[in-house]
Amino acid sequence: MCSNWFPTVVACALTLASPVFAQQTADEVAPEGASDGQVQALTDEVIAALKAKADGVPVNAKTWMVAAANPLAVEAGAKILAAGGTAADAMVAVQVVLGLVEPQSSGLGGGAFLVWYDAASGRLTTLDGRETAPREASPTLFQDENGEPLKFFDAVVGGLSVGTPGTPALLEEAHRRWGRSPWPGLFEDGIRLADEGFVVSPRLAGLIQADAERLARFPDTASYFLPGGEPLAQGQRLTNPDYAETLRVLASEGAAGFYGGEIAADIVRTVRNAPGNPGVLSGVDLALYQVIEREPICATYRSYEVCGMGPPSSGALTVGQILGILDNYDLAGMGPESAEAWRLIGDASRLAFADRGRYMADSDFIPMPTQGLIDPPYLAERAALLNDAGALTEVAPGNPEFDHALNWADDASIELPSTSHISIVDAYGNVLSMTTTIENGFGSRLMTNGFLLNNELTDFSFRTHRDGVPIANRIEPGKRPRSSMSPTIVMQDGFPILAIGSPGGSRIIGYVAKSIIAWADWGMDVQQAVALPHLVNRFGTYDVEVGTSAEGFADMLGELGFEVNARDLTSGLHAIEIRDGLHGGADPRREGIALGE
């Protein structure tokens, strides 16, 4: 058992349990299990980065840095940055390798949100590459013949849950706007590794074994992950020639080679012919897909502006609400070992999640009180609810200012992710924060052309109404499902000072908010902040990270009136601080690293 808050937390996190999946209740299913899995022959730079993570200290650099979820992907991005590429160039290289070595988490068959700081203009831009509901999606897509919601995994596994992928279009759009390196060269490491093979890490092997029954339902998926009927084992060398060929098409034809032609036809055929659970995605859906530029959402916290992705992401708004409520309290004076600090953090999160469940969805379809939700007077009003000594006995959505009727029912949609986060700073001063996903671990379990297809449509509410009142996050054709992904860039005096984000389903919001508090209020460096044991409260139950000193808060939080549950809380935080150089932190619960020069 890990008993000390610092510095042994990192070493403790490296010994967390093998991958598990938790109970399947609304927003309750954990993402991927923790592992420090080594991947294959490691360079001196990777060994040094892994040692820094294990020692609980940041990786430091002067010129550029990349932090992501797998050393092979980080190395691919580092090569691009070292050769003079931008953060956008490096992101493409990182993503296409992640889609190979971490296929359960993200890839070409999924979607992503990207936050970009442009050093030349001083401007923040956010790009929405979220998956989209097909034109044939009906309001009852995830309901049975009696109008009742399907069981969650009955909806997830197969074609019904597949939305139009956005990641390839986002890669191309980011490169078009901000890239300098030749597009084809960004795929070289991904193609080489797919052709020559990579060593299956302990984490990937454990996740395959845990999900073997679902992976076995579809022949193409089974032949890749369960060769000869047995799950891939740690240490096996795995090639993916189909993925290599897909990358060659993207390298030569761009995203058009994905959204049209043979790859698009294969995607549609795979989805619509999925045995037992066919979907409704069409070639027209693929052909019409577009990346959408949206206004960044920025909320004030202390001397910082915490900026991220707006709707359909709920991440920046909910993180902003949590921090905006807590801006009314002196957390720095309380410190990380104060139960009172965690009471405030937990109940601020509950208030923010109440607003999230009522108001947040795709704002192209649903009028939203976006600015009202993060307006300081409104958040001060919400903060006043925390003045009593104990946990809130009741939590309800607030009434943010808005010039439109707000008659929405509360949503209990499930968000069960397999996700990854990338943070990059380049030599030109540009900063990228991108969270990328296929939703659940292994997505829909459907595989084509060497990559898995998402199950993103299950992020919609399965119900359309509650007690006759419409639910904002209900499914509609062309709509993008609400997400908790929270790619974040923290600004101070008009300049970026921190890039951060994480996987983790709806707990992403708590992971990111906690890490920003640890860094901004408690004086932790980025490695300490991302490694800090998790305490997360969304709907009333306080989850504390099992096997860490966070469990020591259980009795104190219980005395304050919280129900407490010790469980695995497997984030995948990757952060870069931009202050007196570059300082990178990588979550010890996963196998990622930070590299820089």
Residue ranges of predicted features:
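Bacterial N-terminal signal peptides that target proteins for export
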Residues: 1-9
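Active-site rim segments in enzyme catalytic domains, especially the processed small/beta chain
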Residues: 100-104, 111-126, 277-282, 430-498, ...
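Noncatalytic scaffold domains of N-terminal-nucleophile
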Residues: 24-75, 79, 87-253, 258-260, ...
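Extended C-terminal subregions enriched in glycine
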Residues: 478-480, 512, 521-568
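Sec/Tat signal peptide C-region and signal peptidase I cleavage site
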Residues: 18-22
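Bacterial N-terminal signal peptides
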Residues: 9-17
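Short, small/polar residue-rich loop motifs at catalytic or cofactor-binding pockets
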Residues: 293, 416-419, 483-485
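Internal maturation/activation junctions in enzymes
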Residues: 43, 328-437, 587
